[in-house]
Design a protein with these regions (language model features):
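Acidic, Ser/Pro/Thr-rich low-complexity regulatory regions
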Residues: 1-102
């Protein structure tokens, strides 16, 4: 998987988490977009950064946290966003004009 594709994926993870936290989508919907065993399998095949795969694996636990420890859900989402941002910081700045044209 290309580094810029991984960075875009990380940006999508942060956005998905923020949208769940603010009620824009449900955890169930976030699982369909991002946090699923299927996504993990696909990313492993594409040789995605293991840190991103680990992050998505943790995201797969959001439904359990919501049902067992609902008072911690916001905190866990914030922790996952911080982790994603820390990974983003390890990537070089994108300096081409438009990623969509690659």
């Amino acid at each position: 998987m290309k580094r810029n594709e991984e960075k875009i994926l990380l940006l999508a993870i942060v956005g998905t988490l923020e949208t769940v936290k603010n009620g824009g989508i449900t955890i169930d919907e976030a699982e369909k977009f991002m946090f699923s065993p299927h996504m993990i399998s696909e990313l492993k095949v594409k040789k995605c950064n293991e840190k991103i795969i680990d992050l998505i694996t943790k995201g797969c636990e959001l439904e359990d946290i919501a049902s067992l420890l609902p008072e911690r859900l916001g905190e866990v989402i914030d922790e996952l966003k911080k982790e994603a941002i820390m990974i983003i910081k390890t990537y070089e700045e994108y300096n081409k004009t438009f990623w969509i044209e690659e």
